[in-house]
Amino acid sequence: MSDAKELKQVLTGPIVNNNPIALQILGVCSALAVTSKLETALVMALALTAVTAFSNLFISLIRNHIPSSVRIIVQMTIIASLVIVVDQLLQAYAYQISKQLSVFVGLIITNCIVMGRAEAYAMKTPPMMSFMDGIGNGLGYGVILLAVGFVRELFGNGSLFGVQILHKISEGGWYQPNGMLLLPPSAFFLIGILIWIIRTYKPEQVEAKG
């Protein structure tokens, strides 16, 4: 029973209580770049979740056989291999989205969330817990990406997943899109607003002064 409870905590904790973007402020760069559309935000979230979960799993499986002096190299080799697999799958089955994501899938290799969970958690924890931790942190990352992508695409282009929701004035409708929301800096402000909302709702996440 305690194992099931711990698994649930590991899986759900990063979504709100210890969100990698909102609380740990990790993985922000990719969040700025890929959230102008919900479609790209969703695919990026799934890609990072898969890489984080399986890199955690594989690193945890061999953690007792990795010399401390080369552990970072081993971790990056495993992560890079998984990123290549994910990138090739996207190019094979979702080529247009792969083109839109451009270099950002490849940059998952250096994402602080992936590296951080591998070093801080997978190196010290059994495989199943590490795998669930990877999924949980991927979901936490994805929740923020989808929230930001929802606002940016809806109010920046009047659409969701490419389907027109708010009909533009230029097409005979009533809505004038806010083009500023499609620029990467807008995501920075939206993430800041999300962090403010979360920390207002959960004041224990506010850092102590001094």
From Swiss-Prot:
Enzyme Commission code: 7.2.1.1
Species in which this protein is naturally found: Shewanella sp. (strain W3-18-1)
Lineage: Bacteria, Pseudomonadati, Pseudomonadota, Gammaproteobacteria, Alteromonadales
Protein name from the UniProt record: Na(+)-translocating NADH-quinone reductase subunit D
Family designation: Belongs to the NqrDE/RnfAE family.
Broad EC category: translocase
GO biological process terms, semicolon-separated: sodium ion transport
Quaternary data: Composed of six subunits; NqrA, NqrB, NqrC, NqrD, NqrE and NqrF.
Coiled coil: none
GO MF annotation terms: oxidoreductase activity, acting on NAD(P)H, quinone or similar compound as acceptor
